Amino acid sequence: MKWKQQLDGMQAYKPGKPIEEVQREYGLKEVIKLASNENPFGCSPKVTAYLQNNAVNHALYPDGYAQNLRTAVANHLGVQETQLLFGNGSDDIIAIITRALLYPGVNTIMADLSFSQYWHNAEIEGAEIRKIPCVEGAHDLEAMAAAIDDQTAVIWVCSPNNPTGVVIPDTALRAFLAKVPNDVLVVLDEAYIEYVTHPEHKDTLPIIDQYPNVLLLRTFSKAYGLASFRVGYAIGQPTIIEKLDPVRGPFNNTSLSQAVAAIALSDQEYIEACREANEHGKKQYVEFCEKHNLKYFPSDTNFIFFDTKADSDVIFQELMKKGFIVRSGNALGLPGFIRVTIGTEAQNAALLVQLDNVLKEQGVFA
């Protein structure tokens, strides 16, 4: 086989352990998964009601243009329908972007502590990858701007950042964009945008008019609680969407996925309720970290990334034995840290009791 050389040594994306596997491995009846930043409250009740009372014709291909969902999102955001591109999750759109713009001879710039699919897909396409170290969990935008040259094709900016949760203030973001040449695509990944409460954050939609080389990425997998339906979308100038759309696979969103995403979008009261509950849950973790003097990054997401002062793989394993799945910082680029999805109040309280016990067992504190 004449494989791409860059595939040598590459591994598939490794998600958090599934609940069923942990139950079998440790003989547990109940396992709480706080590893993949799903919405612990699930999807809107309107979606649940729809799924109970409606069916689709499974023999027919879905609408390849996602017209009903396209109209719903365009109306919700106040953009043109031609400014939208839909994917099988935002991961799909990341792959579309890299396939369209990256190849041997060009480079792509990103933070070193960010979403792994940026460099994973860039590596497959053979592009040079320039990882810029984060500063206190935040993108070093000045260093990223300094790394741009004539061969730079795509810059990835994750805000709020995964796995740190740090959001980029509006003034800093705009100052950075002003330094980026017009022929370089800036992908602003906003998978957690619905959770942002930072006072210096502003609506980013106007940015795509001021900076036509910016593409926003959003998803229904996080706040909307539709991770299993795999619906992500991009917002940008029609000229960018027109170039990316031919790279998109046909029928990449199922009929059911399109329907439930549109319904979920219509229930903004539910999103607000989830955001408020998330803020309350976040305080539980912040109080724990401050009580035990554990460093954490200020999060504008539904997860928190903090230092355990121990081997995070050990903490991960010990919590799993007790029925809690989190993500080890060893797998995310910062050993010693763990990333925990903010769950319900009861889930958070239960995990923190067990984490307290585990950290005492590891000698982190008495």
From Swiss-Prot:
Give start-end of the signal peptide: none
- Superkingdom, natural source: Bacteria
Pfam annotation, one family = Aminotran_1_2
Keywords, ordered alphabetically: Amino-acid biosynthesis, Aminotransferase, Histidine biosynthesis, Pyridoxal phosphate, Transferase
User: What GO molecular function annotations does the UniProt record carry, in alphabetical order?
Assistant: histidinol-phosphate transaminase activity; pyridoxal phosphate binding
UniProt pathway annotation? Amino-acid biosynthesis; L-histidine biosynthesis; L-histidine from 5-phospho-alpha-D-ribose 1-diphosphate: step 7/9
List-wise, which residues carry N6-(pyridoxal phosphate)lysine?
K222
Task: Fetch the PROSITE patterns from UniProt.
Answer: AA_TRANSFER_CLASS_2
* Biological process terms in GO annotation: L-histidine biosynthetic process
Q: Which E.C. number(s) belong to this protein?
A: 2.6.1.9
Q: Does the keyword Oxidoreductase apply?
A: no
Q: Reaction catalysed?
A: L-histidinol phosphate + 2-oxoglutarate = 3-(imidazol-4-yl)-2-oxopropyl phosphate + L-glutamate
Query: Required cofactors, per record?
Result: pyridoxal 5'-phosphate
| This protein's record includes keyword Amino-acid biosynthesis | yes
Q: How does it assemble?
A: Homodimer.
User: HAMAP family given for it?
Assistant: HisC_aminotrans_2 (MF_01023)
**Which PANTHER family does the record associate with it?**
HISTIDINOL-PHOSPHATE AMINOTRANSFERASE (PTHR43643:SF3), HISTIDINOL-PHOSPHATE AMINOTRANSFERASE 2 (PTHR43643)
Q: What is the protein named?
A: Histidinol-phosphate aminotransferase
Traced from the root, the source organism's taxonomic lineage reads: Bacteria, Bacillati, Bacillota, Bacilli, Bacillales
